[in-house]
Regions:
Chain B
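Conserved SAM-binding loop of SAM-dependent methyltransferases across substrates and taxa
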Residues: 315-329
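Conserved beta-strand signature within the Rossmann-like core of class I S-adenosyl-L-methionine
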Residues: 418-425
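N-terminal accessory segments
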Residues: 99-270, 275, 290
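A short glycine-rich, Lys/Arg-flanked "PGG" loop and its adjoining helix->strand segment in the class I
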Residues: 405-417
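Structured alpha-helical
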Residues: 1-149
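A short acidic, Gly/Pro-enriched loop at the edge of an enzyme's catalytic core
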Residues: 377-390
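Conserved Class I S-adenosyl-L-methionine
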Residues: 434-455
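Core SAM-dependent methyltransferase catalytic element
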Residues: 460-484
Length: 158, 484
């Protein structure tokens, strides 16, 4: 059985608190264990925050969550401005590198080390996404389709 | 000779960097010894030391060990633990050199970039990393101990034998090494195979992240030995920042004994002779045959070229199989896409070899772009045109379902009516799966037939089916677009 949540959010930080509540209620209603509810609520909110941070502030964010017996898939879509494309190239490289490290905790530590060694003007943390991979037990991936950014987090196992 | 177009980088604007205000290059602080605190002025002296001047009466002695130093920069309050104050001939007048003994900050970064970076940061995470072994299954721990023991015995033996005949002329060394590989080497390979089979049995009931934790533990124990094998070193270290790069593919294609020692050569050959590597080799003639068959069916010619797109082309060695005659070379227009300029260079070399051998040019476009951002190119069709045949062999194994679906949809939109696609993905039953995960640190997205076909469920105008290579490991999603 698939449980599905579809939401359209304003790209506004104030939306995150309400989203947190909505996500918890939805996930709890699927019959998920309490710890999993916390985990995937974090995943949903991190992805939404990422969209607010890098997305076009005049365009809405579409969020979709599918909970199946063996997987949870969170997808967030929103428009991005062309200025963000440079960041997406970095994100692409970072995610491919993390995917190549099977243990996300090692990637998390390594990324923190790398960030501390970068000049502050270049610092683009991606830490929220790495947190999803490590604490959220999910694989993060993205694709840019025209100017719509589609970021997804797929649970590695339930 | 070639009709090669320049690499299309699909350039987009990059974000302008944020300009940070220039930080001050000095600070005021307080240094403590016993119960005595003394005010100090500080400047960066070197990456890991400071120039220190006492603002008032210096402590006695002015140099030597101190308990702590605290100071403020523009962005941080820094508290150092024990440190040493030294006389230094290079110090400015009235200054000493201060060197921390713990929390060893990078002072150049701190003062010049307002960034706190500590040399011994990694040591702070040690307890967490050491705790990792508490999660390891006892049977697996015993297994890894046995593997490490056996491998070290074989390594020592082969290294000793290598040293014994090292002074022989090269042809003699080569023949002796071939003999070792064929005889004692086979015993070592049998031993490895037995251990891999044991591992499969022990981890059979593991779930999810247990696999990544246990794989990490195994690699940690065998790290030195794994690095002697060029293939294993490459899959584990990922020198290009991603898994499955074109050199790894080339190693699979070569399927030879490579390395600096007999032991390294044997360990290198073990994975490149596995079922998964055989599947990589099998897909090369397979995709060439599919594309060649399409060219024949459409009656491709110099005036009616078959337009081919290879996505994540890697070294594109299948060009040797497809472009096997002057006529075939004149029937096609190739577009080769890869994120990695080194891979495109290797593909260009493969094409150059074909052109040289057949003494005819091949029409080709090179596109350097990641599949995750290539779809950002508005009007892909206008930019690159439409294609009769699109294939991608080693890409979808790394894409999550949502991204795989989006990429496939865009590629499908680039197909001409009646055009075909061949998309590779390893099957979930790959017998080498856990060996790749644990020993090679090479995780893939494995798919079932159902998973793979589900990526096409929104294609109203297409027929989709699944084919396999001889090993059954390499699954191919075949798609044919409707003719109208």
């Amino acid at each position: 059985m698939t449980h599905e949540l579809d939401l359209t959010l304003r790209p506004d930080w104030q939306e995150v608190e309400q989203l947190n509540q909505q996500a918890m209620t939805f996930l709890t209603d699927t019959g998920m264990a309490h710890a999993e509810v916390d985990t995937y609520t974090m995943v949903i909110c991190e992805l939404a925050e990422n969209s607010i941070k890098y997305g076009d502030s005049s365009q809405p964010i579409c969020l979709n969550v599918k909970v199946r017996d063996k997987s949870v898939c969170v997808q967030v879509k929103n428009k991005v401005r062309s200025e963000a494309h440079g960041h997406l190239r970095e994100l692409d490289q970072t995610l491919q590198w993390i995917r190549g490290v099977q243990d996300p905790y090692q990637a998390y530590l390594e990324r923190i080390r790398e960030l501390s060694r970068e000049p502050i003007a270049n610092a683009r943390s991606c830490l929220g996404l790495i947190r999803i991979m490590y604490e959220g037990h999910s694989d993060v991936d993205f694709v840019l389709d025209d100017d719509t950014l589609n970021v997804s987090a797929l649970s590695r196992s339930r | 000779m070639s009709e090669h177009n320049d690499v299309d980088h699909n350039a987009t604007d990059t974000a302008a960097p944020v300009t940070a205000a220039a930080p001050a290059n000095h600070a005021e602080g307080a240094i403590k010894r016993g119960g005595q605190t003394t005010a100090v002025d500080l400047q960066c002296a070197s990456r890991y030391s400071l120039w220190l001047a006492y603002r008032d009466e210096p402590p006695h002695p002015a140099t030597g060990a101190f308990d702590s130093l605290t100071f403020e920069t523009d962005a941080h309050t820094i508290a150092l633990g024990p440190c040493q104050v030294l006389e230094d001939a290079d110090a400015p007048d009235g200054h000493y050199r201060l060197v921390p003994m713990a929390s060893i900050h990078d002072f150049e970064k701190l003062f010049q970039q307002s960034r706190a970076d500590v040399l011994d940061l990694a040591a702070r995470n040690l307890p967490l990393i050491l705790q990792y072994r508490n999660n390891i299954d006892p049977a697996f721990r015993t297994f890894v101990g046995d593997v490490a023991y056996d491998i070290s015995v074989y390594k020592e033996l082969f290294d000793r034998l290598d040293a014994e005949y090292a002074g022989e002329p090269e042809p003699v060394r080569e023949v002796i090494q071939q003999g070792l590989i064929r005889n004692t080497g086979q015993e070592f390979i049998d031993c490895l195979n037995a251990h891999v089979a044991d591992m499969e049995r022990i981890i059979d009931n593991f779930e999810g992240e247990q696999h990544s934790q246990h794989g990490y533990y195994l690699r940690k124990q065998l790290w030195g030995e794994l690095l002697t094998a060029p293939f294993m070193a490459r899959t584990n270290l990922k020198p290009r920042g991603y898994i499955g790069d074109s050199e790894m593919m080339q190693m699979c294609y070569r399927n030879t004994y490579e390395g600096d020692s007999t032991f390294g050569k044997l360990l290198h050959h073990h994975p490149v002779s596995s079922a998964a590597a055989q599947a990589v080799r099998n897909r090369r003639p397979l995709v060439a045959a599919m594309a060649g068959d399409y060219a024949d069916r459409m009656g491709a010619s110099a005036d009616n070229r078959m337009r081919l797109l290879s996505v994540a082309c890697g070294p594109a060695l299948e060009l040797h199989d497809l472009l096997n005659s002057r006529e075939r070379c004149q029937q096609v227009e190739y577009s080769l896409l890869d994120q990695d300029d080194l891979a495109l260079g290797e593909a260009a070399a493969a094409l150059g070899a074909v052109e040289k051998r057949l003494q005819t040019p091949v029409k080709v476009n090179y596109i350097q772009e990641s599949v995750r951002t290539l779809l950002a190119t508005r009007a892909l069709r206008e930019r690159w045109g439409e294609f009769h045949f699109i294939y991608s062999m080693g890409l979808f194994d790394y894409l999550t379902p949502p991204v795989a679906k989006a990429v496939l949809s865009k590629l499908h939109a680039l197909l001409l009516p009646g055009g075909e696609m061949a998309i590779g993905n390893f099957h979930v039953t790959n017998p080498t799966r856990r060996y790749m995960d644990y020993w090679l640190d090479w995780p893939l997205y494995y798919r079932t037939e159902e998973d793979f076909l589900a990526l096409t469920e929104d294609f109203g105008d297409a027929t989709a089916w699944i084919e396999y290579d001889d090993t059954g490991v390499q699954m191919l999603l075949r798609i044919r677009k409707a003719t109208t």
